[in-house]
Amino acid sequence: MNSQNYSINNFKQIFDNDILSDVKLILKDNNKELSLNLHKIVLFTHCKFFQAMFVGFEESTKKEVVLNVQNVDICRDIIKEFYGFKSPSVTRYQNWKCRLEYHICCNYFLIDNKFPDIVNINKSCFDDLLNLIDKINYNDVTIRLLAKNLPSNYDLSKLPLELVKKMRNKSCYSGFVFFGNEKHLCIADENFDNIRKFQYGIDLGNDYCYMPNSNKIVRVVSNYVANFSLQSESFECYKIRTKKFNKKFDKKYKIKSSDSFEKPIYNSLRNEIIIIHRKKKYSIICVLDAKKFDLVRTICKFKKSKEKLCHMALSYDCNKLVFVLTIINEVNNKNTEIYVKYLDTGVQERIYKTNRIVNDLKFLNNDIIVFYNNKNNSGHLKTYDISKHKKLPGLTTFPITHISICQEKYVIIVTNMYTHIMVSKKFSGIKYFENCKVVCSPSGKIVSYGNSKNFLTSIDDYENYKTLDSLEINSILPVNVKYDIHDKLNDYIDSLKKIEEENI
């Protein structure tokens, strides 16, 4: 035999070869049987499973060993890796079932491996999925996977009640979606104890909104809408189209490559997205259908030479749209005007005018807006009641860098020194928040980010906080996710409770 270079990581030439073979491994699954001529030293060196088998067990002296495995072909590929062959897991196992079986086989051989990212599973394959999960483990990840893929017409009586309850709990949750510097999106629970990461090969843009009706995150990239479903955890991209709008309203309305779309706001009442369309000579507030993202109508149009559209906000009842314009007059002086557009009637009126720049604007509740400006090293928070056309008491403080609303009653004001929390004209301070951005969940969880450190705290106990130093957060949204199947699971559990009560 010619001299060969058999390194510890390259035994390709002797895989399934009787040369120096000291063990015959017979792999069996429900459909197939395969015999391999192998070498104990190679198996022992690369795999904890075989280390245990060949030391202290009766197989250590046997020339033939039979293993009942999940998938013979996958186990053969794993063993081939021990002999120096390239891992096939990335290129070969794209089918969801094969990826789960690969995970099961790795677990069988005591090989560390991450649970695979499963995106799309045909609902008709749910029983197959259930059988595989039963061989893996019932944990947060696998139960969520089952809940996502449970068919709406599935007979729940076939499942253990405890599993149905766990799927019900995992099919509805509160948390945060955030974006880092890389091209990825992360989903975290409210306490940031469990974080899942999804990576894509395109830039997802900067402007985004959450659509709770469909459990989707929408981000705008040029004249495209990037759409991430929190239920299927899959990604789609749509081009903003004007064909239907051209036929019905304006034949000349076009979207050019130089145009941009900014600041999307979701209107849950009408299932629409309100967005700013910036063109070369003017800006338009327009409306997109939230299913296919077609342009359906326009709300307002402004000439860029005279009016700069800066900010806009939608009331919680989705009937009042407030926007901020910087007006340039004939002598080039600038004034800022705030308008309200009543979407149910189409009426538009100016509600506020100032000679200062408005840096940001939010709705505190359905009638009161909060906005701020900075001048002469001071920050000025303003509040205004739209229904009463009345200015309300505000706050003068250090220069303001960010404002956020929590539970429709708290105003969180971030300055370059520290942070105020305002409620019912009373103030308190959070000293460890400064020069940052803040987002609040409906339950009162507060995340500060954009500074050297990220923090998690609560509106009810903001003196205590959790640092999120290991996370890179550029933008973040609170989400309340409810899968389509949640109500069915809830109704089923309630019906069993009623039957049990009637039988008592």
From Swiss-Prot:
InterPro entries, per database record: BTB/POZ_dom, SKP1/BTB/POZ_sf
Highest rank taxon of the organism: Viruses
Chain ranges passing through the membrane: none
Domain BTB: 21-91
Family, as annotated: Belongs to the mimivirus BTB/WD family.
Name this polypeptide is given: Putative BTB/POZ domain-containing protein R842
Organism encoding this protein: Acanthamoeba polyphaga mimivirus (APMV)
